[in-house]
Amino acid sequence: MEVEVKLRLLTAAAHLRLTTLLTPYHLKTLHQRNTFFDTPKNDLSLRRAVLRLRFLQNAAVSAASPSPPRCIVSLKAKPTLANGISRVEEDEEEIEYWIGKECVESPAKLSDIGSRVLKRVKEEYGFNDFLGFVCLGGFENVRNVYEWRGVKLEVDETKYDFGNCYEIECETEEPERVKTMIEEFLTEEKIEFSNSDMTKFAVFRSGKLP
């Protein structure tokens, strides 16, 4: 079970102010492309499951020796998001980047990957293969990661086709305590925020900003 604090930054200015204040604690910047798959009848979504390929690259590595791009396949199931605290069952593993790219162009190729996560999707949701699956599209996400007050903060700028959203995420085993700590800091620094009440996937599927 993945447990995260999720707080939405209300404006681009709030995002800029926060990332500026956190500069001394910066670890890395990740450029991510999140792409989703389901059947034409949304069989996974109807059962509160999400199948995602995440393509990412670490922009903090020097230009002289750039990090290779990576691809992570993940299954998220039974999510809840209440009072800015998210709980979701998540299973993920890395696959070859080029194979992931091929699956975006031809989702049926998901059937050819010897992936533990994809095998679980078939077994738990009753699919023989992925021949009927379609690519739903996705969105870009720029994630700045910080080591701050004993926790790892992830500050996201998510770029949908219909606009941008800004969010703080923090995975923790003490969500209430960590949420209070972050909220007090944001309030003290006059950074506008609210509890996140929709996942990024839900925003993407809604086609409009929250």
Swiss-Prot record:
The lineage of its organism: Eukaryota, Viridiplantae, Streptophyta, Embryophyta, Tracheophyta. It is found in: Nucleus. PPPase is active in the presence of Mg(2+) ions, while no activity is observed in the presence of manganese ions. Residues 1-208 form the CYTH domain. Its EC number is 3.6.1.-, 3.6.1.25. Keywords: ATP-binding, Hydrolase, Nucleotide-binding, Nucleus. InterPro entries: CYTH-like_dom_sf (IPR033469), CYTH_domain (IPR023577). This is Triphosphate tunnel metalloenzyme 3. One of its GO terms (cellular component) is anaphase-promoting complex. One of its GO terms (biological process) is root development. Inhibited by 2.5 mM Ca(2+). SUPFAM superfamilies: CYTH-like phosphatases (SSF55154). It comes from Arabidopsis thaliana. Disruption phenotype: Delayed root growth and reduced length and number of lateral roots. Its cofactor is Mg(2+); Mn(2+); Co(2+). Disulfide bonds: none annotated. It catalyses: triphosphate + H2O = phosphate + diphosphate; ATP + H2O = ADP + phosphate + H(+). Transmembrane segments: none annotated. The keyword Transmembrane does not apply. Optimum pH is 9.5 (in the presence of Mg(2+)). No activity at pH 7.5.
